[in-house]
């Protein structure tokens, strides 16, 4: 089904190719001329790069159907987070990303300055 019309992956690849062509159409300015001339070329180049960047963001948001801004991740308060020393190494993270491990008893990670 890779060739069907409206395939989201193919549409994304086409959008990325278009963005690549946009960036390639604006090469870095050459280093010839006086200092002021080079400065003006770089200033115009940066302005074009900004325009290309904003166009690229608009293309990607239209293609992906969402905004370019990341969705904020809700994290629990840092005071409640703790290292869980009692966790079985074979279990892994079965709880997933949404359920952080909160230990009731504080575990001792470093001993109090005694050497053996």
Curated annotation (Swiss-Prot):
GO terms for cellular component: host cell cytoplasm; host cell nucleolus. Keywords: AIDS, Host cytoplasm, Host nucleus, Host-virus interaction, Methylation, mRNA transport, Phosphoprotein, RNA-binding, Transport. Residues 18-26 are annotated as: Homomultimerization. It holds the Pfam family REV. A motif (Nuclear export signal and binding to XPO1) lies at residues 73-84. Residues 36-48 have a biased composition (Basic residues). The modification Phosphoserine is found at residue 99. One of its GO terms (molecular function) is RNA binding. A motif (Nuclear localization signal and RNA-binding (RRE)) lies at residues 34-50. It is found in: Host nucleus, Host nucleolus; Host cytoplasm. Asymmetrically arginine dimethylated at one site by host PRMT6. Methylation impairs the RNA-binding activity and export of viral RNA from the nucleus to the cytoplasm. Phosphorylated by protein kinase CK2. Presence of, and maybe binding to the N-terminus of the regulatory beta subunit of CK2 is necessary for CK2-mediated Rev's phosphorylation. Residues 26-48, 84-116 are annotated as: Disordered. GO terms for biological process: mRNA transport; viral process. Its main location: host cell. Belongs to the HIV-1 REV protein family. The RNA-binding motif binds to the RRE, a 240 bp stem-and-loop structure present in incompletely spliced viral pre-mRNAs. This region also contains the NLS which mediates nuclear localization via KPNB1 binding and, when the N-terminal sequence is present, nucleolar targeting. These overlapping functions prevent Rev bound to RRE from undesirable return to the nucleus. When Rev binds the RRE, the NLS becomes masked while the NES remains accessible. The leucine-rich NES mediates binding to human XPO1. Escorts unspliced or incompletely spliced viral pre-mRNAs (late transcripts) out of the nucleus of infected cells. These pre-mRNAs carry a recognition sequence called Rev responsive element (RRE) located in the env gene, that is not present in fully spliced viral mRNAs (early transcripts). This function is essential since most viral proteins are translated from unspliced or partially spliced pre-mRNAs which cannot exit the nucleus by the pathway used by fully processed cellular mRNAs. Rev itself is translated from a fully spliced mRNA that readily exits the nucleus. Homomultimer; when bound to the RRE. Multimeric assembly is essential for activity and may involve XPO1. Binds to human KPNB1, XPO1, TNPO1, RANBP5 and IPO7. Interacts with the viral Integrase. Interacts with human KHDRBS1. Interacts with human NAP1; this interaction decreases Rev multimerization and stimulates its activity. Interacts with human DEAD-box helicases DDX3 and DDX24; these interactions may serve for viral RNA export to the cytoplasm and packaging, respectively. HIV-1 lineages are divided in three main groups, M (for Major), O (for Outlier), and N (for New, or Non-M, Non-O). The vast majority of strains found worldwide belong to the group M. Group O seems to be endemic to and largely confined to Cameroon and neighboring countries in West Central Africa, where these viruses represent a small minority of HIV-1 strains. The group N is represented by a limited number of isolates from Cameroonian persons. The group M is further subdivided in 9 clades or subtypes (A to D, F to H, J and K). HAMAP family: REV_HIV1 (MF_04077). This is Protein Rev. It comes from Human immunodeficiency virus type 1 group M subtype K (isolate 96CM-MP535) (HIV-1). The gene is rev.
């Amino acid at each position: 089904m890779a060739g069907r019309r409206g395939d989201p992956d193919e549409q994304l690849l086409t959008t990325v190719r278009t963005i690549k062509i946009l960036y390639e159409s604006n090469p870095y300015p050459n280093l010839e001329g006086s200092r002021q001339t080079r400065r003006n070329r770089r200033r115009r180049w940066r302005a074009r790069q900004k325009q290309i960047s904003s166009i690229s963001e608009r293309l990607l948001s239209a293609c992906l159907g969402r905004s370019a801004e990341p969705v904020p991740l809700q994290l629990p308060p840092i005071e409640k987070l703790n290292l869980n020393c009692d966790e079985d190494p074979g279990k892994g993270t079965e709880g997933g990303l949404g359920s952080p491990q909160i230990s009731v008893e504080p575990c001792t990670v470093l001993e109090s300055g005694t050497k053996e």
